[in-house]
């Protein structure tokens, strides 16, 4: 099923890219465990990495610091590798409240979560691709270091079907039930099967557009065919097919029974400890909760919060790392850590926060001590599991630089010829009035401005002041959710307003070529928000505009400011020299606004073509591409209802058109999920 990686791009590497690609590939072939790609904003870092993947033909995981950047990378990689498996693996929770206990108020908070089904399907698709083929790029968030089902058990639970295989219908149905598929003869949806005489239709959990029909004759598999679950039209017949479990957390029955005995042993030991310490309430609470879970596991094969018993279910010893997405990545896989100066500290912090919450639950009798082993990876475990790694950042952290030694690959020259912003330092005393006049100059020529302040209060006051003086301004702060944040950035690019004020939310993130001025207030206040890395990242937001400029308001030049200005000047001089040598005139980027959200859009269109003769492709069109994420979500719910109505009325042509449109809208919505 694997194909070689085939890079699809109208451009050839240029600027610093050819040298960066060569050095990274040589380092990987020489067996270097760590390399750093120091690439400035707009230098084509993703294109460089895509070239390395295509040349070396190795399965790759790309780690991004948040869902927004993961979505952007997923869209870019899907464009570079349309014929290969580009997968998306982020947390599938739209909302997640972990269970917790607050001793001071004696409050227990139950676990509460809302799962995004589309992202769950994409996660299952990602692990399937890693197990089945080598031409895989998985774009993941830090969700990749959290516990996942054991790959060995996952592989053991698969159902392999081949034409001519001797197996009766009841055996297939029993195996499907073990894989947590449910029978539903009325509503055929993902993770279900239906039975009609000797025919079993199965809708694989990792698929959203193809189902399997198993035709039996006299306890023998006579035919296996793939069909469109909506129209019922057969796409092709296959000699064999593998059904993957509905969830990553399936466990064979014998393993569950063995785990139950181990849980009972731990419960008995823990009860003795609690009684010895005169913790009678905690002992009763723990016994009651655990016995209930054991009964559920015995009857149903799972229970609410079964992940807290994952150590027993996967057969690990106390303190051993949980199985994660890294266990699915082949031994010769490649890891790319994007925006590594943010992602690496995130990985280090996940374990500590999780541990503190669970220790309280164990101490007060809500969970057994083994629940502490249901956790994300510790940083040292991540280091041990990580394959050969490339760290990508415009401002690499000390960790990456230390690990890479001399292997820091510079990518400072942009193929577009764009120069780093001109930097000016101006006094603090007149910063607000000076900023107002700069904003008016930019607004007059239809360009945008980003302003970063030190405190929330100052951001609010500045926004109010600018509004009073007639400027079109918005304020971006930590209380705004992902969906609304993307709406604000989109509106800024479309020119709905001219100025965006924020604190620490304007650094690493989406490309905004329309921004020509970045103003940093109180730049001379040394600290986290005004460190060398923060300043370089913030200045870089204006690096995609031909008129890019950064104004640092400060009464003195701090060491961080001096380093940031020096590094920006170095990059600017190198680009200027390259432009002169090659006769390049800097060109601004004309990136469509819909690119922020348009993930896999072309792929969705391609899928829609030719799925049955005579079908007209859905006009997913222009209207939807310009919609806000909230409107997209509303539109998706509306269309799903229409699609099911058409299917019930046997109007399969119309239902299929809407289904193709839903494909595209769901891809667009991923960025904000």
Swiss-Prot record:
Record flagged with keyword Phosphoprotein: no
UniProt entry keywords in alphabetical sequence: ATP-binding, Cytoplasm, DNA damage, DNA excision, DNA repair, Excision nuclease, Helicase, Hydrolase, Nucleotide-binding, SOS response
Positions of short motif Beta-hairpin: 92-115
Transmembrane segments: none
Domain UVR stretches: 633-668
GO function term, MF aspect, one: DNA binding
A GO BP annotation: nucleotide-excision repair
Domain of life of the organism encoding this protein: Bacteria
Domain Helicase C-terminal: 431-597
GO cellular component term, pick one: cytoplasm
Matching Pfam families: Helicase_C, ResIII, UVR, UvrB, UvrB_inter
SMART domains referenced in this protein's UniProt entry, alphabetically: DEXDc, HELICc
Major subcellular location class: cytoplasm
Task of the protein: The UvrABC repair system catalyzes the recognition and processing of DNA lesions. A damage recognition complex composed of 2 UvrA and 2 UvrB subunits scans DNA for abnormalities. Upon binding of the UvrA(2)B(2) complex to a putative damaged site, the DNA wraps around one UvrB monomer. DNA wrap is dependent on ATP binding by UvrB and probably causes local melting of the DNA helix, facilitating insertion of UvrB beta-hairpin between the DNA strands. Then UvrB probes one DNA strand for the presence of a lesion.
UniProt record similarity statement: Belongs to the UvrB family.
Subunit field text: Forms a heterotetramer with UvrA during the search for lesions. Interacts with UvrC in an incision complex.
Domain notes from UniProt: The beta-hairpin motif is involved in DNA binding.
Name of the protein in question: UvrABC system protein B
Organism: Salmonella paratyphi B (strain ATCC BAA-1250 / SPB7)
Gene coding for it: uvrB
């Amino acid at each position: 099923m694997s194909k070689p990686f085939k890079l699809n791009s109208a451009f050839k590497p240029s600027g610093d890219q050819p040298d960066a690609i060569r050095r990274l590939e040589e380092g990987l072939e020489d067996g270097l465990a760590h390399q750093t790609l120091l690439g400035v904003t707009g230098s084509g870092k993703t294109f460089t990495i895509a070239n390395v993947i295509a040349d070396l033909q190795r399965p790759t995981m790309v780690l991004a610091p948040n869902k927004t950047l993961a979505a952007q990378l997923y869209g870019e990689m899907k464009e570079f590798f349309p014929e290969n498996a580009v997968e998306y693996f982020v947390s599938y929770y739209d909302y997640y409240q972990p269970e917790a206990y607050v001793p001071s108020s004696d409050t227990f908070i139950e676990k509460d979560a809302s799962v995004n089904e589309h992202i769950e399907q994409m996660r299952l698709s990602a692990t399937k691709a890693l197990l089945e083929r080598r031409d895989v790029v998985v774009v993941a968030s830090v969700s990749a270091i959290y516990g996942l089902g054991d790959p060995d058990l996952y592989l053991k639970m698969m159902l392999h079907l081949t034409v001519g295989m001797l197996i009766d219908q009841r055996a297939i149905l029993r195996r499907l039930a073990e894989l947590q598929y449910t029978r539903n003869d009325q509503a055929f949806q993902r993770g279900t099967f239906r039975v009609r005489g000797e025919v079993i239709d199965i809708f694989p959990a990792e698929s959203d557009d193809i189902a399997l029909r198993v035709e039996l004759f006299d306890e023998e598999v006579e035919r296996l065919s793939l069909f469109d679950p909506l129209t019922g039209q057969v796409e092709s017949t296959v000699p064999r097919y593998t059904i993957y479990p509905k969830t990553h957390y399936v466990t064979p029955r014998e393993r569950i029974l063995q785990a139950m005995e181990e849980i009972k042993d731990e419960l008995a030991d823990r009860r003795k400890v609690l009684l010895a310490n005169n913790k009678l309430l905690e002992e009763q609470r723990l016994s009651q909760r655990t016995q209930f879970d054991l009964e559920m596991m015995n009857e149903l094969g799972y229970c609410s919060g079964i992940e807290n018993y994952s150590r027993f279910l996967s057969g690990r010893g106390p303190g051993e790392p949980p199985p994660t997405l890294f266990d699915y990545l082949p031994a010769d896989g490649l890891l790319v850590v994007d925006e590594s100066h943010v992602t690496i500290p995130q990985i280090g912090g996940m374990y500590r926060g999780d541990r503190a919450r669970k220790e309280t639950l164990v101490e007060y009798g809500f969970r057994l001590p083994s629940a502490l082993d249901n956790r994300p990876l510790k940083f040292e475990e991540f280091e041990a599991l990580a394959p050969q790694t490339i760290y990508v950042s415009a401002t690499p952290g000390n960790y990456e630089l230390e690990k890479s030694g001399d292997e820091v690959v510079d990518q400072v020259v942009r193929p577009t010829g764009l120069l780093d912003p001109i930097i000016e330092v101006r006094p603090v005393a007149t910063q607000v009035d000076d900023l107002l006049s700069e904003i008016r100059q930019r607004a007059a020529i239809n360009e945008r401005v980003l302003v970063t302040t030190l405190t929330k209060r100052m951001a609010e006051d500045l926004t109010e002041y600018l509004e009073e003086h007639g400027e079109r301004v918005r304020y971006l702060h930590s209380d705004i959710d992902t969906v609304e944040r993307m709406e604000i950035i989109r509106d800024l690019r479309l020119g709905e307003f001219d100025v965006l004020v924020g604190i620490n939310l304007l650094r690493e993130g989406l490309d905004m070529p329309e921004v020509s001025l970045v103003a940093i207030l109180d730049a001379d206040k040394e600290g986290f928000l005004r460190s060398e890395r923060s300043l370089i990242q913030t200045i870089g937001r204006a690096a995609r505009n031909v008129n890019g400029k950064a104004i640092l308001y400060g009464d003195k030049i701090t060491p961080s400011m001096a380093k940031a200005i020096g590094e920006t000047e170095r990059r600017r001089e190198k680009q200027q020299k390259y432009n002169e040598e090659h006769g390049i005139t800097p060109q601004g980027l004309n990136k469509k606004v819909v690119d922020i959200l348009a993930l896999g859009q072309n792929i969705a269109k391609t899928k829609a073509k030719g799925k049955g003769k005579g079908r007209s492709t859905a006009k997913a069109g222009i209207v939807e591409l310009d919609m806000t994420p909230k409107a997209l979500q509303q539109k998706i719910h509306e269309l799903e209802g229409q699609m099911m109505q058409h299917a019930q009325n046997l109007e399969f042509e119309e239902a299929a058109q809407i289904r193709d449109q839903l494909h595209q809208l769901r891809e667009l919505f991923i960025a904000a999920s």
